[in-house]
Amino acid sequence: MNIENYLSETLAKVFQKLGYAESFAKVVTSTREDVGHFQCNGAMPLAKFAKKPPLAIAEEIVEHIDAEDIFAKLEVAKPGFINITLAPKFLADTTNRFLNSNKFGVQNNLPNRKVVLDFGGPNVAKPMHVGHIRSALLGDALQRIHRFCGDTVISDVHLGDWGTQMGMLIEEIKLQSPQLVYFDENYTGEYPTESPITVQELAEIYPRASKRCKSDINEMEKARLATFELQQGRRGYVALWQHFVRISIDAVKKDFDSLDVHFDLWLGESDANKFIDEMISYFQANNFIYEDEGAWVIDTNKDGVPPLIVIKKDGGVMYGTTDLATLWQRSKDLDPDEIIYVVDKRQSLHFKQVFSVAERTKVVSEKCKLKHVAFGTVNGKDGRPFKTREGGVMHLADLISQAKEYAKNRMPDENDDSIIDQIAMATIKFGDLINNYANDYFFDLEKFAQHEGKTGPYLLYTVVRAKSILRKIFGDNYDIKSLAKDYKVVNAHNEYEEKLQLQLIQFPIAVQRAYENSQPHHICEYAYSLANSFNKFYVNCPINNLDDESLKKARIALCMATVKAMTIASDLIGISIPERM
């Protein structure tokens, strides 16, 4: 139950009764704790329609509200705010209801939707680096959130395995080892099952090939021709390319496993290749495509968005072509209600073109919503793209090692590597996801590793503290679900209990905001606020030495509720919680 929605519905009945539009009854969390828990600001925009002063409207609404079981206090403030304080019993009862629910008050979306999430997107032959973090962590958080809210999610890594970089690699290896059978057009036998190069060699070859092509237009033309021949099915090139893909996927899977990020599908641009001819024929039959200076293009019919080139002058396909073909494939095979792309904001124009063409040509059905979660860049403390101390791009494995080193330095006596791993992951993930995805941000590992402030380790420390209270009382194998039947939250005895209860019941609000806006930072902010509220409660509300047994049980129930809410919130952003720190 989203408490903001519940209160909005309660006030909407009064608005309707008085002849006002229900849409003005929206309740939001108060921006000032000193005046109330929640507030309704609808009287101000309503005033110009009702032709009454907003203060008079607010007073009229409050006068007609009859819900003493929900509200302890309703106050009107200039110029027309309605400040709401919840009744202590309603606050306690709602906390208990959430504690005893499987998802801490969050209800499944109805009807169930099918969502395809396209994220990760590493390129074949390139090691994963710090720049891949945002897509991987943001996409993983979104798939966790969507599943939690009841959607059927199909996640696809969508490998970059079909572009000009493949031709660059082929030409570079041909230059290096021309005797390989992959380059003999007359060869008719079976190609070797073992790759002629390792993934480490592949990672070294690509920068060399890229540099050569950028400095020599003739080399770039060779790479483009090799790419075209690969896409046309030249046997030797296809066999060599298959080695590139296989050894790259093995390495990439290890990197994603280290982040606890997993995918349902491991498809690439190449998997859509077989649909391109069928799709082009469809475009031609319906007069969507036309020739322009030797290339084949489709208009977007959107102001400021240029036409999309589908077939190049040389007959090769573009990145946009394979993206359209991927949408064609997903529509036919999966029939989703929504497809979400978690990709760098520098690709925004590209996705505007692709989405516009896909919708105009009905490559996707009318029910299917297309969304680009366009994230900002990861910068170092100097404000520039994040680099190693030597100035190079930091590989993901090196970043994780650094995070583990920071964790170990802060806990030198900790010998359990699994705990160090959990702290390192919390450091990286929370440090990234606490930021609104649309913004660039500074990746400061030293700051993220602190055990105080808005960090992953602080989050873990708080939950471990709450769990240790329960473990001291119930032993190691306690079960919150069964214990909650006998331990109930009661009306708050002081401000610390009240604020903790208030924070606990806002969990569904954070989840709904994260879900609707594709913004996991709402869950991070919630978890941080809950951690602060619990730590103040912990300091000011003793448990173990209490003589009042009913109060003791009520505070234990608040510890249970905190552990449950924090555990779910942490899982939604891909963070696992150790038993101790």
Curated annotation (Swiss-Prot):
PANTHER family: ARGININE--TRNA LIGASE, CYTOPLASMIC, ARGINYL-TRNA SYNTHETASE. GO terms for cellular component: cytoplasm. The gene is argS. This is Arginine--tRNA ligase. It is found in: Cytoplasm. GO terms for biological process: arginyl-tRNA aminoacylation. It catalyses: tRNA(Arg) + L-arginine + ATP = L-arginyl-tRNA(Arg) + AMP + diphosphate. GO terms for molecular function: arginine-tRNA ligase activity; ATP binding. It comes from the Bacteria. Transmembrane segments: none annotated. Keywords: Aminoacyl-tRNA synthetase, ATP-binding, Cytoplasm, Ligase, Nucleotide-binding, Protein biosynthesis. A motif ('HIGH' region) lies at residues 122-132. Monomer.
